[in-house]
Amino acid sequence: NKPEELDKKDLKVQISINQKNSTESRSLGFRFRNSFMPDSINNIDLALSQMSYILTPEERKELKKLKQSDKENFFKKAWARRDPKPDTKINELMDEYYARVAFTEENFSRGTAGGWRSDMGMIFILFGKPDDIQRYSSMQSNYSYETWYYFSIGQEFAFIDDYGFGDYRLRYPFVY
């Protein structure tokens, strides 16, 4: 396995003792992972790609120049800068961010496209669960649309599914 994928690998240790005509075996399963990453992350390249919505332009430039061996360190430092409570062992913001990514993968994935890459996924990752959702569908045509409301920040986002396949796109571009 590649080292960047080993951090979540399910492993098993088996010990066998041969004594005279008898063999006794015991096994123990465990999971090895990096303590600075949430449980949902098992690939550093994917985790860094999923950070694209919050990376600064300078961080993006730096990331493009990195060797594979330097990516975990970049990940740690980028999240350390964003840690709302650096005195604790847990980075609450990182955990929430990747919980949202996991939600988008579960709810907004279409075909081979990851849910986090979808327009709905991007908005959900950046702003969380909407305060309210209005859904509309047209019986005469195939299109449907949804409007997500975020009252606390005074934002609303309209998504349109032009063809009725569940592929909702932002009606108006959003620059993050």
Q: Which residue ranges define each predicted feature?
A:
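Residues within mature, well-folded domains
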Residues: 3-6, 23-176
